[in-house]
């Protein structure tokens, strides 16, 4: 399995519904095993082995204490494990399929966290895949479940369905028109959470936001996904209206901004992660507005992923100081955009 190589996961390659705005959808199910305290370090490795036995050769097991710090960071940048697992889960592990659209974290905050990712706004497809895996596990192992409270989890906010549905969106139109603050306030008033690209603990940046449900108790899985889908449909509509307004009323200023960012990335020799991310966001907007017919959405995803620190260290084959990282980032970006 080439998970540590510079390639996109399937959910970043394939197209999906509303993928001019929605980058990806994710469903995560948190589960714990009955009669096992969660989590207890002395028991953790045995739990990993017990759960791993449930899965066939379509999944590959990676134990956190058997892979390098760089490899862990690569998995985080590909959204296949959480930053928490990389930093704190000494006895954790992850099961991955070849397409990298299913990630099953073992001994993170819970014994088992099933993640399924899809391109675009396809939450129901991700839910179906996650529930299928969940059912397969439950045929072999017994979950910690309470008739009143539902699935029992290490964090009380996950009790009930144990489901976290999230959607990653690119909202440069709402950011530029300064409507993003009111939109986020409206989202939060409906009981949803807005975070950055790496979820809990990360802040939104470069017009990329992650929207997820907060309530897991008192609603069914289908109701949670339906509610989030309806909210996302409203956000998508507002973002498209904002983009149209920008193109119609501020066309030359918008075009200048987008092409300046393109010129920067095509010609820079030193660039920071934040400066690159902002320019990539501008170019992605330009792609969606038809300014760059030769640049695909897949290429935009390559720019985002392969300009991250761990992938740059992988490219260089060594650790780097801050300046070296900026130089390698500029080189990688130029190569992706075609300036070889």
From Swiss-Prot:
GO terms for cellular component: extracellular space. CDD domains: bacterial_phosphagen_kinase. Keywords: ATP-binding, Kinase, Nucleotide-binding, Transferase. Its EC number is 2.7.14.1. Gene3D superfamilies: Glutamine synthetase/guanido kinase, catalytic domain. Belongs to the ATP:guanido phosphotransferase family. This is Protein-arginine kinase. It comes from Listeria welshimeri serovar 6b (strain ATCC 35897 / DSM 20650 / CCUG 15529 / CIP 8149 / NCTC 11857 / SLCC 5334 / V8). The gene is mcsB.
